[in-house]
A protein has these predicted regions:
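Catalytic machinery of carbohydrate-active enzymes
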Residues: 1-337
Length: 337
C-alpha cells in the first residue's frame, strides 16, 4: 500500500472471542473509511488471522514492549512505527481509560478523532452490539449484516493437510469438538463429552477433538473416558485452528472464543452454555444453536466458582444432536438419523 495512505487504528486487548465479537464494528469502520488502511492492535494470533481473512490490513501485537509506552502515556514519536499514528485519522479503542491518559497521549500525536470505551457493560442484548455502540452516531453503515470469515486457499489447504496427517480424509461428515473454554466453570463434564463422541460415531459422523495450550485438564479428563482411537489435534496457531474448523460439517463446543470462530467460519455450530448468558454471549446465525442444562441460579461469578452441582451444565447429549440436525446448514445436513 502507498506509504502516504491514511490510516485508522483499532485497539482491542481482549481475548479471541472478544475480538471476534467486534468484527461487525470493524466492518462499519471499513465502510466509512474505504480508502484508509486499517491497523489492529490486538493479540498477535487473532490479529494474524483477521489479516489473513482481509478484515484488517495490518496487525501489531499488543503484547509488544514497543507499544507499552503508548498505554502508559509515555509514547514518543520515535517509539512507534511511522504509519501507525503519524497519518492516522481515527483511533477506536475498546479499553478502559479512566484517567484519560491514553486519550491525551493519542491526541498529542495530532489524531483528530479518538474514541475509547470499555467493552464491559451490562447494557445491550448482545456483546457485539456493545462494540457497535462505541460507533453509534459516528458512521453510517449496516450494523446488522452478519459477517463471515473467509480463509485464503493456502490456509484452507493447511487444514486439509493437518487432518490427513492423523488419517482423516474426506469421507464421513467431520464434527470438530472443542473441550475447553476460558474457564473450567463453563465446561460440561468429561462423561458428557464421552457420550457425545460415542454418539457421533453411532451416527456415522467423524469426531475430532481440538485442544489448546490451556486445555490440559480437559485432555486428561477425556482420555479417562476410555474412547478408542480418539483423534486429537493441537493446532499450533489460531489460523491453523481456523483452517481445521473450516473443513468441518459440524462443531460442538462451550462458551468460548473457538466456538465464535467456528460460527464465523460458517460451520454449523452447537454451543453448550451454562452459567453465562447466551442472549449476550452466544454466536449469532441460523447455523448456530445453543443448548444448556437448567437455568443458572448463581448470583455472581464467585457463586459460580463455589457451585459444585453445576446443574446449568448438565446438557443432554440427545439435545445436542437434535440441535445439530435441526440447524439450517444451508450446505447440507450432517446427521443421517
Amino acid at each position: 500500500m502507498p506509504g502516504s495512505q491514511r490510516t485508522i487504528v483499532v485497539i482491542h486487548p481482549g481475548g479471541l472471542g472478544d475480538v471476534l465479537l467486534s468484527i461487525d464494528a470493524m466492518a462499519v469502520m471499513r465502510s466509512a473509511f474505504p480508502q484508509h488502511k486499517m491497523i489492529l492492535l490486538a493479540g498477535s494470533e487473532v490479529g494474524h488471522l483477521l489479516g489473513q481473512c482481509g478484515v484488517i490490513d495490518q496487525s501489531l501485537p499488543i503484547e509488544s514492549s514497543r507499544l507499552s509506552a503508548l498505554f502508559s502515556g509515555r509514547a514518543q514519536r520515535s517509539d512507534l512505527q511511522q504509519d501507525l499514528l503519524w497519518r492516522c485519522d481515527l483511533v477506536v479503542g475498546w479499553l478502559s481509560d479512566h484517567d484519560g491518559l491514553i486519550r491525551r497521549t493519542l491526541q498529542e500525536f495530532g489524531i483528530p478523532r479518538v474514541i475509547l470505551q470499555s467493552p464491559a457493560s451490562t447494557e445491550g442484548p448482545h456483546q457485539s452490539e456493545r462494540f457497535l455502540q462505541t460507533l453509534q452516531g459516528e458512521f453510517p453503515g449496516d450494523a446488522r449484516a452478519p459477517l463471515r470469515l473467509h480463509l485464503p486457499q493456502q490456509v484452507l489447504q493447511s487444514g486439509t493437510d493437518a487432518l490427513r496427517v492423523i488419517g482423516i480424509e474426506q469421507g464421513a461428515p467431520l464434527i470438530v469438538c472443542h473441550l475447553g473454554s476460558g474457564s473450567r466453570h463453563k465446561c460440561v463434564r468429561a462423561d458428557t463429552w464421552g457420550t457425545l463422541i460415542q454418539g457421533c460415531r453411532a451416527r456415522q459422523l467423524m469426531p475430532v477433538v481440538v485442544l489448546g495450550s490451556a486445555d490440559e485438564q480437559a485432555e486428561m479428563a477425556i482420555r479417562g473416558q476410555g474412547l478408542p482411537e480418539l483423534p486429537i489435534l493441537r493446532p499450533r496457531s489460531v489460523t491453523m485452528l481456523a483452517a481445521i474448523l473450516a473443513q468441518a460439517q459440524g462443531y460442538i463446543g462451550h462458551d468460548s472464543g473457538v466456538t465464535h470462530l467456528a460460527a464465523l467460519l460458517g460451520v454449523p455450530t452447537v454451543a453448550m452454555f451454562g452459567p453465562t448468558d447466551e442472549q449476550r454471549w452466544a454466536p449469532r446465525g441460523v447455523h448456530v444453536a445453543v443448548v444448556r442444562g437448567e437455568n443458572c441460579m448463581c448470583a455472581n461469578w464467585d457463586a459460580v466458582r463455589a457451585c459444585t452441582e453445576k446443574s446449568c451444565l448438565k446438557v443432554k447429549p440427545n439435545e445436542v444432536f437434535e440441535a445439530l440436525d435441526a440447524i439450517d446448514f444451508r450446505y447440507h445436513r450432517v446427521t443421517n438419523s
